[in-house]
Amino acid sequence: LLTGNGLTSLPPSLAVAEQEASVTSLTTKRYILRFPALETLMLDDNKLSNPNCFVSLAGLKRLKKLSLDQNRIFRIPYLQQVQLRDGSGDWVGGRGSPRKQPQSMLQSKSWIYEASDDQPDYTILPMKKDVDRTEVVFSSYPGFSTSETTKVCALPPIFAILPVALFPSLCELIFHNNPLVAHTRGVPPLLKSFLQERVGIHLIRRKIVKAKHHILMPRKDSRKVKTQVPKVPKQPMILPHPSVMIKSPSKEMLESEAELTTEPPPTKTISVEREMPIEGLGGPPMPHRTFVPLPPICSDSTVHSEETSPRSDAAGRLSADQLSDEDTKSTESIFLTQVSGLSSSIFQRDDSEIKEKEQRPPSTAPREAKRTQKKPPSASFPRKYHGYEELLTAKPDRPCSTCVKHPLVYRSSKPRLDTLQKHYVPKEKRTRRIPVPPRRKTRAQLLDDILIRMRDTQNITEAPLGAVLRQRTEQRLVNQKQFLEAKKLLKEFRARYRRLVRCSLRSVFGTTAPPQARPALSGSQPKLGRFLEFMDEFYQEPTASDLKG
């Protein structure tokens, strides 16, 4: 295993080594195989590019699997087969059977695949056009002849794998991720028919990728959306409070009002109070009204403002239509805030108070003016919000308030909505105690256990005889071997009992023929086992001397 070592070349004496001169004579040379039993060689993920590396591998006669992936190999040379003598005197041949020759000199022989009828099935011809490109000369290696040029087949680059057939016992070749097969796909039919089907070399030119298991995501029923949630409007629907429309007159109008207010009629304040809610809610719709802004608030002088409506019958009041353009331009605007959250009970109370005041005699104007400032207008809802009056009169719902105070936070897929849920509190993680590993046995103890197991190889199964014999037919089929052993044991007990009875009768009556033995006890009787155990313990079979006497 030489994976990922960054090797650029292999030593020439990797597989075959020459003996020393002291051992051999000067006239003869002998070579020894270094790895005669090597069958698998992994040279993947290296930088092998020189064809000389195949010269180093040519002496491995039992090489079956060769891995050359992720290297820089662009061709494999054709090597002349040379017969070598190993230490035992055998000649190293090719895929054919090795043979011996009396000569000790190296004899080169061209490689030709011969069939059974001694005629060449195929031959390898050299390329005549470009000899320098295909010629490979190995001058320093003693085991291969360099007298003849290397023969290369005039085929596309993928056919440079054909010289692999010269390896005697090669069965599998892995050569992907090399320049040799970088620009081609698949195995050509010629290589497949020759190398795989004839010679028996399995070619692997693609990296084997293990199939990944398909990831299945479980579908949970709780995650399915079965109902459509209605769209929430951007602006919530809120019942608006009746807006107050106020006008600010000019200086001339203020002076005229001052003259009129010196002698106010007693019924004027009542009409203003009754007209205020009508103007706010019962009057014309919002887009048709004329809004008049308020003047700036001054601390020195007080500004009197009044509200007018087209329905008012009070004389001496100026309406918004009578204002001139100059007066409206001279005024400044002030924004009023909307009061929300008022219950309808307040509005109903104001309506009842207004009715009582209408029935009562009118009082002084300043007191009534102070009261009007404190009382809000009555509630009269427009048609747009018809049907929502109960929202203002409804009492607070206790279940709703508890749901708001206790939000539902679940960690389970099926929560119980009929009960109050507790807040999720994460549990503290507790570290588990690591179990103490058993004490490791020494080598002597392990060896003793192995010897004990080898010595005692019997497997003993204890079972009551009566329970095994009383089993049903279904259980007998399951434990058929156990039932047969119990039946055989019962047969032996019966034979031993008969033998005991015969021996006892012979000892009593002498040579007289014993009477016919009674049938043995059935195996279903529970006392049979105890009786046989008692007889085996206290009775010994009679010897030959006892029988003679």
UniProtKB/Swiss-Prot annotation:
Residues 480-500 form a coiled coil. The keyword Nucleus applies. LRR repeats lie at residues 37-58, 62-83. Residues 221-242, 277-329, 347-384 are annotated as: Disordered. Keywords: Coiled coil, Cytoplasm, Leucine-rich repeat, Nucleus, Repeat. GO terms for cellular component: cytoplasm; nucleus. GO terms for biological process: response to X-ray. It is found in: Cytoplasm; Nucleus. Residues 348-360 have a biased composition (Basic and acidic residues). Residues 227-236 have a biased composition (Low complexity). Its main location: cytoplasm. InterPro entries: Leu-rich_rpt, LRR_dom_sf. PANTHER family: X-RAY RADIATION RESISTANCE ASSOCIATED PROTEIN 1 XRRA1, X-RAY RADIATION RESISTANCE-ASSOCIATED PROTEIN 1. May be involved in the response of cells to X-ray radiation. This is X-ray radiation resistance-associated protein 1. The lineage of its organism: Eukaryota, Metazoa, Chordata, Craniata, Vertebrata. The gene is XRRA1.
